[in-house]
Structure formats: C-alpha cells, structure tokens
Amino acid sequence: MNLKLLVFLLIVLGFRFYLFYQNQVKFADGQEVSFETAILSQPQVVGSQHRLTANYKNQKIRIITSRFPELNYGDFVRISGKISSKNDRALMYFPKIETASQSSNVLQAGLQKIHTLRQKLIVLFSKTLPSPSSSLLLGIIFGIKEQMSKDFSENLRATGVFHVIAASGMNVTLIAGFISSLFALFLKRQIAIGLSIFGIAFYAVLAGLEASIIRASIMGILVFSAQIIGKQTLAVNGLFLAGFVMLFISPNIISDIGFQLSFTATLGLIFIPKIRAIRKIGVIGDSINTTIAAQIATLPILLANFGTYSIYSILANGLVLWTVPILMVVGGFGAILGLIVAPLGQLLIYLCYPLLLYFETIVNFFGGIGGVLVVNNFPWQFSVGYYCLLVSGLIIFKKK
C-alpha cells in the first residue's frame, strides 16, 4: 500500500475515533434506560440464564437475564432496566425484555428463518449422534456450544482447540486454509482456492451470519481471492482496506477479540512463511503449518484475553484440525440433505462419527496431561515488544 495513502487513512481513522469516543455516552451506575434493538448474535445459554450483548448509543451493554422466555437471533425486542456501570463496562441484570413491534424488515425476516433452520438441524444432529459427538459437530459447523458438557469444553480450552467450536474469525481463517490444502491434493490450485472461498461463504450462512463471522469472512475471501490472482500485495491491501472500512463504520470493534483474532490470524497466514520440512507431511503438515502461523500471529492476544496457553496446543491442533474441513463438508451436506430426506441426511452425518471419536480422543488425552501455562496480569509491554520482534524477524527473513 502506498505510504502516503496509508498515512492519510490512519489520519482519517484517528479523527473518526476521536469523534466516536467524544460523543460516546457514559452511563451512570443505576441509570434507568429503555431501548429497542435487534438481537444480532445468538444469546448464550449458561445454566438457567441467557447472556447477550446489545448496542445502545454506541455502547455495548452486557445483559444477563432469565433462560425463559427464550430469546433468539434476529428477535426485535424492547429492553428496560437499570445499568450497572463498573470498570467502564455496562451491565444489565434481569431487565424487562419484551417483543417489540416493527415494520416488515427483510433482513430480520431472513435472520429469523436462518435461526429456525438451525434449530431444526440441532434436533437432526442430536437424534443422529450420541453426546459429546453431536455437540462437537454442532460446534464445528454452527458454533453452538450450549449442549456441550462442561468437562469436554474445559478440555477443549486446555488444549487450545476451543476456537474450532467458537465460530470465530480465527476459525474462519483456519478452516479456509485447511479446505484449500485438502482440495489442492487433487485439484488445480485456483480451483481449490475458489472452493475455499465458497466454503467461507457457506460457513458464514450456517454460523448464522453474525457480525463477527461476516467480518472474518470478508477478510478470508479477500485473502483467498488475491491468492487466485497471485499477488500477495493485493491480499495485504485488501485486508487493510477491509479493516479500515470496518473500523470507520464501527470504531468500537477494535476492542472486539473476534476482530483482533481475525485480523492478526489472516496477516499471519499471509506473511509467516511455511516450514518446508513440515509441509512434506501432507495434509496434517499443512494443518500444523497453518496452526503455527496463526498462533504465532495471535499469541499475545490469546494470552492477554484468556490468560492461559497450552504447551501442547500446536501439536494438538495439528493432529485434529485436518479433520475440520472433512467434518464441515460431510456434516454440512448431511445437514442440508437431512432437511429434505432425513434418513439420508442422518447417514451422511453418521459418517462423521469415526473422525469425531478421533477428535475427542486427542482432545481428552492432551486435556488430561496438563501442561497449561497460566498468565495473570498480562503486560501490554510484552505485546508491543513481541510484535516489534516478529515484524523485524519477518523483514530480515524476507531479505535473505
């Protein structure tokens, strides 16, 4: 990207940030509010509670409410209650939530249809596979974690594989890379990358077209489109331009972990060179290489936000992530077919069972042997120093 253009865009973005935060409302502790909003991400179910995030006057409000009545992605609701403002975070505990009337909205109607479709698929998967295999496959394809057992969920976290079921930006980036590697074994590179782009779009729809998934999908499609053309510069320019547009429209996403992981993981896949010796292993080697690149790029973000890191993470990811595109393709087609002819769809879904058992065995094995590093009060100075060293190393490597 032209240096003058980059400086200009940064100045524009800086001015946009200034205006955004100058006009941002500061909520007082105990302040009464009432507002209408659409639920643009699937609420989390934790025990007997619903947890969701709502946007009000350019502020994110974390809401904790009762499990019933059920709230779904795409619902338009009126929320009334008191705000608890602590440490610059706005929370609402058990506010009054009512269904709000709204004029016909094509987008909202589409979102509600997607939710209804997902609910039917959840029932289909649960009837076909035992737990935790059904919940694992639901997590991989739809990012649904509510039905997963606490023990297995903890093992996923302990081994650094939790991102697979998080429907996150990092997940989109990794999955696209794996699909490309898989199809490149028997198809031309351009066709394999084209199928990866289709896979990204397909995943975004199945995951519910949530904002974080759409952002990550745009980044992934830009990168893989540039690979078809054969210009790394185009991928970088496209990624930075996408990041600029997203931040200009919604400056508060700069603190969103999903956005941070999407952006840095994608940069890692573009710039961090693949290890040739590992690449010779085949599909698993490509999985390990992709994992290494993504984890090198995102390590400070993961440590700062989650405070833990598994020393076996790269190995565990390399052993299981090659199964993800297969599970997504077979399970995804099984889900679609199951809506038309349930028995045939269930047959395809059941074909995923051996790979799911393999996945679970690896996760439970590494989750049971420990090796988790706990980092408390992660210093921001480390992140700055880490990325300075990483950029310097890549520049030196490129010159050789």
Language-model features and meaning:
Residues 268-373:
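Alpha-helical transmembrane segments of multi-pass integral membrane proteins
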Residues 130-134, 149, 189-195, 323:
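Membrane-interfacial loop-to-helix junctions in multi-pass transporters
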Residues 17-24, 204, 306, 332, ...:
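Transmembrane helix-loop junctions and nearby membrane-interface residues
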Residues 37, 81, 140, 168, ...:
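Divalent metal-coordination and catalytic microenvironments
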Residues 2-5, 19, 46, 50, ...:
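C-terminal regulatory/interaction regions
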Residues 7-163:
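Membrane-interface helix/helix-cap signal primarily in integral membrane proteins
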Residues 107-115, 135-146, 207-213, 232-238, ...:
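Hydrophobic alpha-helical transmembrane segments
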Residues 2-7, 12-15, 152-314, 377-400:
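Hydrophobic alpha-helical transmembrane segments in multi-pass membrane proteins
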